Amino acid sequence: MKLGSDELMTRRAELPRVALKRPVSRMTMSAKMTLSALALAVCFAAGCGAARPSKYYQLTVPGDMAPAANPNPVPITLLIGRMTGSALYREDQIVYSSGGESMGTYEYHRWAEPPTEMIAEIMLRQLRASGHYRGVYSLRSDIHGDFLLHGRLYDFKEVSGSAEVARVTLELELRNVKTGNTVWTHFYSHDEPASAKDVSAIVAALDKNVQQGIAECRASLDEYFAAHPPAPPATQPAAAQPAPQP
């Protein structure tokens, strides 16, 4: 049976459309399965679920306490300036190294404040509480001081090796505000052994090391002023008494 030319052309035109329907359907299903697998892989790689919490640590900062009673304090006003350091120590990361040139930071263990700021605050509180000086204030205050104490933090980190240690290296400098001359310096460097190989033990060792270093610097500063006692402030001349009336 022969088909008319119009009918034959119509059937030929319909055949490709029918043949293409099934591959398109199979490709769509395959793409969906691939996308689902990729989404699961990304989810696992990103650590889907609750994020790991960060832990924060701080050094032991003395509380606001009344200065110790001292009938004869050194007659100066001491200003506590900035403690400078590398960018690592002006941020809140806890730094570690293996004793070589490379250093790293812990991702989920951080300081509550940058180490440079905590150490400056400890110096301020301890020197003020000692009662050894007429006054101890922060450089940020409006108080006029006689001497400025400031310094630089070189090391404040965990050092891994045969034993875990907490290394603190700093240098303090005392400057006469009036003359601008540096009159005293003190360098401190010490490796304090940690009781265990974990971050909490390293923090405890760093804290102990800092307290020991500041105590050593305080003793050296006291020795300087004992050997170079500043002149007491000049007393104001007494007001002239009025002449008696005749």
Language model regions located:
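Bacterial N-terminal signal peptides
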Residues: 36-45
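Short secondary-structure boundary motifs at beta->alpha junctions and helix caps
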Residues: 102-110, 178-216
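Extracytoplasmic/secreted envelope proteins and their assembly/folding machinery
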Residues: 116, 120-124, 130, 207-214, ...
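Generic short beta-strand segments
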Residues: 83, 152-156, 189-190
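A structural "domain/chain start" motif
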Residues: 48-116, 224-246
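Surface-exposed short loop/turn segments
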Residues: 50-74, 125, 130-181, 246
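C-terminal or internal capping secondary-structure element at the end of a domain, subdomain, or sheet
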Residues: 165-175, 185-189, 212-224
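Bacterial N-terminal signal peptides that target proteins for export
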Residues: 4, 9-36
